[in-house]
Every structure is written in structure tokens, then in C-alpha cells.
């Protein structure tokens, strides 16, 4: 019989059907090739939004800069970046009036954090622009290179290990007449391969010293490298994102720490919380507006969209905000916080790799690096690119473009949220002084606006006033892309609200399945995802049970570990059948060893090894949990591991899962091809750095919280700690006299070697 699909929904409240509208199957689009074009778009657009501003020239770098602040008031609905300083300051003052003490308290909290933060805070984060090599590197390597070069140029405040002292070095480095750096270069030679007798290109990497004069150094210190944002769904065009260098990062971190403290205290802010906490916070605002709208009042909600949020924000405005927020604070603190916006007012955008040309007829390819765009003949380019290059040329210096206005993506999310909330805050009746009033939610550039008024005209007037107020601080609400509805139905940061936030389970679909780390981690992650969705996303018991069965099936196909008694033939089945036959307690075999699945929705929180431990044969236990098993290169095992899960929409989320170490927790070996490239030295540095840090963490297990202070080097700290620990262990009888003597001898040897060095 045919089933009429609409019957399925008869008993379902409409909001629960949202999961059936899931549009994102398949892989998201990734970018290939160069991001130069996208970066030029960003630079040109940003200048266009501020074109009526004043042009000046930076005296140090010679870069032309456009300042739109206090520019003309808008006369049309086009997006613009002409924020008015006095309006921003007034919005801040009203925000403080509504939340007495909010700035003062946040400053005190931040001051404490500033004095305690260690420089290794900057090792967090992925790709970072490394100014010494003029390209991207992992954050830890970029920091190590920066510190190494600072020290060789006589900047040593950073040796205390405090971030604030490293920032002192950054400030001093900008005053130096020149900086000497070590940079890598490649030599390419064509040689004949002995084995294949073909000609191959051999690369060797060399290091050379180079002197940067003040101007060149400043340009590098103020540079943001750009890349193309990957995996963005629902867009036809890619866009550029920026990664700043180590000089900027520390200052940005402190500004964002202050802004985060403020956001935490603002009920309209969707940052820095997430998940259920965020939903609860936001539901409160909606509830307030709905209860306060008396029976006679109308209440409407705008699902808002801002045009080019980042490109219309201005670092000079952020400087004004910080100056106001910190106005009663000590001078040193105000200075530290004002440096980030000042650097951003003078920032340079690196144009990336440049363009690749190829001639089909002659089978030739050639790269035109960004540095050449300033003076290359434009006849080689198509019309569109020609226009871009012509427009950007006056701004170019050494392959970077001067970009004073605009903020680049994702740099000051917290601080720009504070600005947005300050406008929402002005919607209180005591400020609007009329019959309409508004409130709302703000999370970086995303907002929802709730307007209450006695009639439709009032609602319209309220929206208009909000729109115009935003314009005064450089926020451009897009009338085309914003959508108004009766309060009770709206969307905010991919949360859909209909009489409460609706669980949109389909958004989590991409994270179901086998991750492909190893058999042990994949099993654990798979069941944890299902468990988390039962807790957070209304995944019901029947659906969860089905998801679990599908996951186990998927897992068995991925690792070819069908049950020992199944008829499916794979290249592992011979071994698994043998194991199955010689195992007494078959229920104890892990799924990855051809065992049965004992998971159901009640025991998803228990790691599989623990679930089956009592059921295992003794010799199987011994093989499974054997740290000396020669076939497994083991990770250090923590009780909890972290993985990244990708929802369909929005940022990748970090997720914890239980990690029980078994011989299935293998790590694939690193691909060899990297070892033959210029990256090799960097890889070795990074591994050495990693090893040292791991060793250090072993000696000071809580070292992520309290590091030893005032001891001159890591090695000495570890040696002295080893001696203390050994003495305690010896006196309490945990180690024998011989072992104690051996430890002491090793410690002395290490110290001796250090002295000789």
C-alpha cells in the first residue's frame, strides 16, 4: 500500500519536522589554488565602504591609509563604515549605566589574568603567520622562531615566561633600527635519478642571516597572512580569512579576554557560552520580551543579517571603546590594551601566493608572485582581475596591501559583540522615550531583534530607529536579508526558535559515522556522539537504537571485522574466524576483533573494554592490554581524549571521549614524503619542542596550571624536581636504595653535561 508522506506529520508539532529539511548531504566545497583574488576583493570592498574617509600616509612604513571615522552621515541604505566616535562612546556610557560596575569589574579580572598568563598561551591555535619565514607555520613553531630571533637581537624580557614580558619585547623590537633574522631558502637542482634514470628536481634547504631595516620589520610585524576559508556551505563564492603573526596575537588575546569578561555579564550576548547554556541564556531574553508585552502590545522578531560586518567595523572605533572601558585603570593596563587596535589600524594584508598562468599550447606554467603585481603588465589578465589589480595598486608595498579600515574575519569577535549589545541596550523605554522598545541577542555578526509596540506603525518606527542607530556605529543591518516574524519564531546562530529552541538533530548528521582514527578511538567517538545527541538534541530512544545499529554496521565494514560466525568474507575473516573459534567467552571479544556488539542505549557511557572486561578470556585480556606489545606504537594515554566533530553548519566542535588504552589504539606512522622536503627541519624542531614539553609535563603533572617559577631553565627545574620526588619515594619505601642512588647519579650526570656545554 502507498503511504502518504504527509500522514507522517499529522501527530508531529511542526517545529519537530525541522530535521527533515536538511539540505547538506555530501562534502562541503574546498578551495584550490590561490587566495590572492579573494584577498584583493576584501581589500577593495573594505576601501569602497569607507571611500569618503580621509587619506593619510603612515610615516614609518609609507603605507597609504584611509580613515572613515566621523565621516559623512549616511544618506542612503548602502553599507558604510563611517562610525561616529561620540555615538560609540555614548552607547558605551549607556551600557555602563544599565550595568553598573560592569567595565570596572571586567578590567580588574583581566588585569589579574594579564599578570598571570604564560607566553605558551600563544602556542594554542593552528596556522600562524611566521614573519621570520614569511609564510604560515604551526603556532608553536612560529612562537619559537620569534623568541629565538628576539633573543639573538638582545630582547630578553621574554625569558621570564610571562606573556606580558614577551609583549614588552615586541614593543621594543618595533623601535629597533634593524632586526637580524635567520631565514630558510631553497636551492633546486636538476639531477638524474640513479634508479629510474629520469631527471628529478632535488631541493636542499639552507639557512641564511638577513637584516631587516625598521620599515621592512614593521611591515612584517603588522602583516596578516590570508587564506581561503574552506568548507563553507551555501555560498557560490569563496572568501578570504586572515591569520595574524605573533606580534599581534598576544595583544589581541588580552583585548578579547577583557571583552569576554564583559560579554559574560551581558544577558544579550550569545558569546562566549555555547550549546545548552547559550540556549537557556537566549530563551530568557525572549521570555522577558513576551511576558512584558502586555495583551494590548504587539511583539515582532527580526532574524537579522548584517552586511559585511567585519569590513565595516573599524579598529579606531575599538580603540575608542577600550579607551572608555579602561578610563579609570592604571596607565600600563590602558597601554597594553590599546596596542591591538592601533596595530590593526596600521595592518597590512599579505596577498598570498599570487597568480598561476598556464599556456595550453606550450604546456608551460608560471607563477606570478604577489610581489610582482605592483608593476607587471596587465595585458596578461582578464578584465575582472585587471580591475582588481588597478584598484589595489596604490596600496601595495612588498606584496602586501595596506588595509587600515575593516577588521578581517574572526579577530575581535567578543569586542564587536559588546558594540552590538550596546545598541540593543538602547532599546529600553527609558532611552527610546516613546511607546516602542526593543531588546535582542547578539553573537559576533549575527543578531536577533525583538521589537514591542502598541501597533504596527510603532513596530516599523522601532525597527527604523534601530537601523539608523546601528548605522552611526558602523553596523549595517541588511534589509534584503533580514526577516521579520511574530515573536516566537526566529533563527539565531543556526538555532531555530519556536516556542523554545528546537533541537535540529539533522545538523549533527555529518558527525555520525566512523572517524578513521583507529579502532579504539572510533568506537568510543561513535557511541559518544550518539550519547551526546540523546542528551542535547532530542535524539529519541528508538532513533538512537537505530543509529547505534547503523554505526556498528558501518564500523564493521570500515575495519572488516564482521562477527566471527558471520558468512561475510573479507581479507581479515580468516584470522578473525580462527580467533572466534579458540575463544571460550565469545561475548568478551571486542567488535573490532569480530566480537558481538553489547552496546545499547543504556550503556553508551561505558568504554567497550570496560563493558566486556569481565567477559573476556584471561589470555585475551593479556594480549589486549599489553603496553609491551611490539606491534603497537602507543600514544600517551590520558583518561580522556579530545576529538573534533564537524556539524553540518557552524564551527567544528571539540568533543571529549573516554580513551582506554588497548593494542587497538595504534597511531599511523607519519607519511614519509614530508621527510624529503624543506619542511623536514621544521618537523624535527616541532617534534623536539613537543618532546621537551611532554617531558616537562611529566615532571610537573599539573604544569598546565602552576609552573615552577624563578628557576632559570626547564632542565634545572626537572632535575631538582626529580631529586625531591626520589627522596620522598625512597623515604616512604616506594623505591629501593639502589634505584635511589641511580636516580641521583643520573641527575648529577645531566648537570655535569650542562656545565660542559
Swiss-Prot record:
Annotated stretches, region: Promoter-binding site: 249-256
Posttranslational mods: Phosphorylated by host PRKCA.
Bias-annotated ranges (Polar residues): 55-64
Cross-referenced Gene3D superfamilies: 6.10.140.720
Pfam families named among the record's database cross-references: Flu_PB1 (PF00602)
Main location: host cell
A single Gene Ontology CC term: host cell nucleus
Region (Disordered): 52-82
Motif Nuclear localization signal, chain ranges: 187-195, 203-216
Protein name as catalogued: RNA-directed RNA polymerase catalytic subunit
Amino acid at each position: 500500500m502507498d503511504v502518504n508522506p504527509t500522514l507522517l506529520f499529522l501527530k508531529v508539532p511542526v517545529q519537530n519536522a525541522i530535521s527533515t529539511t536538511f539540505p547538506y548531504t555530501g562534502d562541503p566545497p574546498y578551495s584550490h589554488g590561490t587566495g590572492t583574488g579573494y584577498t584583493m576583493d576584501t581589500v577593495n570592498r573594505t576601501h569602497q565602504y569607507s571611500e569618503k574617509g580621509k587619506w593619510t600616509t603612515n610615516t614609518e612604513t609609507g603605507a597609504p591609509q584611509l580613515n572613515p571615522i566621523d565621516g559623512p552621515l549616511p544618506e542612503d541604505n548602502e553599507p558604510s563604515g563611517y562610525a561616529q566616535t561620540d555615538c560609540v562612546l555614548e552607547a558605551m556610557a549607556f551600557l555602563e549605566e544599565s550595568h553598573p560596575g560592569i567595565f570596572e569589574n571586567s578590567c580588574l579580572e583581566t588585569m589579574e589574568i594579564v599578570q598571570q598568563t604564560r607566553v605558551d598561551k600563544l602556542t594554542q591555535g593552528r596556522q600562524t603567520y611566521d614573519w621570520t619565514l614569511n609564510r604560515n607555520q604551526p603556532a608553536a613553531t612560529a612562537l619559537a622562531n620569534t623568541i629565538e630571533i628576539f633573543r639573538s637581537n638582545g630582547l630578553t624580557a621574554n625569558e621570564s615566561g610571562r606573556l606580558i614580558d614577551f609583549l614588552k619585547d615586541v614593543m621594543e623590537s618595533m623601535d629597533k633600527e634593524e632586526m637580524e633574522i635567520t631565514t630558510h631558502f631553497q636551492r633546486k637542482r636538476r639531477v638524474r635519478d640513479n634508479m629510474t634514470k629520469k631527471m628529478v628536481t632535488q631541493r636542499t634547504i639552507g639557512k641564511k642571516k638577513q637584516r631587516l631595516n625598521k620599515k621592512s620589520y614593521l611591515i612584517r610585524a603588522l602583516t596578516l597572512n590570508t587564506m581561503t576559508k574552506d568548507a563553507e556551505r551555501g555560498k557560490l563564492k569563496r572568501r578570504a580569512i586572515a591569520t595574524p603573526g605573533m606580534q599581534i596575537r598576544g595583544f589581541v588575546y588580552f583585548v578579547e579576554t577583557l571583552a569576554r569578561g564583559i560579554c559574560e555579564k551581558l544577558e544579550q550576548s550569545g558569546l562566549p557560552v555555547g550549546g545548552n547554556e547559550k540556549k537557556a541564556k537566549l530563551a530568557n531574553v525572549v521570555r522577558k520580551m513576551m511576558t512584558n508585552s502586555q495583551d494590548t502590545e504587539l511583539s515582532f522578531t527580526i532574524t537579522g543579517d548584517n552586511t559585511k560586518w567585519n569590513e565595516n567595523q573599524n579598529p579606531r572605533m575599538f580603540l575608542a571603546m577600550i579607551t572608555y572601558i579602561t578610563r579609570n585603570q592604571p596607565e600600563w593596563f590602558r597601554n597594553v590594551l590599546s596596542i591591538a587596535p592601533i596595530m590593526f589600524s596600521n595592518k597590512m594584508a599579505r596577498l598570498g601566493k599570487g597568480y598561476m598562468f598556464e599556456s595550453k599550447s606550450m604546456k608551460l606554467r608560471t607563477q606570478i608572485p604577489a610581489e610582482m603585481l605592483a608593476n607587471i603588465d596587465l595585458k596578461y589578465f582578464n578584465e575582472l582581475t585587471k580591475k582588481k589589480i588597478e584598484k589595489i595598486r596604490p596600496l601595495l608595498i612588498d606584496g602586501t596591501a595596506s588595509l587600515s579600515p575593516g577588521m578581517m574575519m574572526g579577530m575581535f569577535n567578543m569586542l564587536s559583540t559588546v558594540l552590538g549589545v550596546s545598541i540593543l541596550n538602547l532599546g529600553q523605554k527609558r532611552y527610546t522615550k516613546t511607546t516602542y522598545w526593543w531588546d535582542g541577542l547578539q553573537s559576533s555578526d549575527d543578531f536577533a531583534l525583538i521589537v514591542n509596540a502598541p501597533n504596527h506603525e510603532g513596530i516599523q518606527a522601532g525597527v527604523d530607529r534601530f537601523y539608523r542607530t546601528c548605522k552611526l556605529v558602523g553596523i549595517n543591518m541588511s534589509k534584503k536579508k533580514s526577516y521579520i516574524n511574530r515573536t516566537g519564531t526566529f533563527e539565531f546562530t543556526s538555532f531555530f526558535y519556536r516556542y523554545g529552541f528546537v533541537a535540529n538533530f539533522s545538523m549533527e548528521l555529518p558527525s555520525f559515522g566512523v572517524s578513521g582514527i583507529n579502532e579504539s578511538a572510533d568506537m568510543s567517538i561513535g557511541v559518544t556522539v550518539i550519547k551526546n545527541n540523546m542528551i542535547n538534541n532530542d535524539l529519541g530512544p528508538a532513533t538512537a537504537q537505530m543509529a547505534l545499529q547503523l554505526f556498528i554496521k558501518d564500523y564493521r565494514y570500515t575495519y572488516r571485522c564482521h562477527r566471527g560466525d558471520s558468512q561475510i568474507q573479507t581479507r581479515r575473516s580468516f584470522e578473525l574466524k580462527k580467533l572466534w573459534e579458540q575463544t571460550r567467552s565469545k561475548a568478551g571479544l571486542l567488535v573490532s576483533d569480530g566480537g558481538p556488539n553489547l552496546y545499547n542505549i543504556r550503556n553508551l557511557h561505558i568504554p567497550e573494554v570496560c563493558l566486556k572486561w569481565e567477559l573476556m578470556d584471561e589470555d585475551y585480556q593479556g594480549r589486549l592490554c599489553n603496553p609491551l606489545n611490539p606491534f603497537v606504537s602507543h600514544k600517551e594515554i590520558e583518561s580522556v581524549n579530545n576529538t573534533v566533530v564537524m556539524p553540518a553548519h557552524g564551527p567544528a566542535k571539540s568533543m571529549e571521549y573516554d580513551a582506554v588504552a588497548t593494542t587497538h589504539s595504534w597511531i599511523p606512522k607519519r607519511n614519509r614524503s614530508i621527510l624529503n622536503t624543506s619542511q623536514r627541519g621544521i618537523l624535527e624542531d616541532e617534534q623536539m619542542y613537543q618532546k621537551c614539553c611532554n617531558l616537562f609535563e611529566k615532571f610537573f603533572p599539573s604544569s598546565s596550571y602552576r609552573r615552577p617559577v624563578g628557576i632559570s631553565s626547564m632542565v634545572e627545574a626537572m632535575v631538582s624536581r626529580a631529586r625531591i620526588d626520589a627522596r620522598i619515594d625512597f623515604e616512604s619505601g616506594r623505591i629501593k636504595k639502589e634505584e635511589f642512588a641511580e636516580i641521583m647519579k643520573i641527575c648529577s650526570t645531566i648537570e655535569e653535561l650542562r656545565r660542559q656545554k
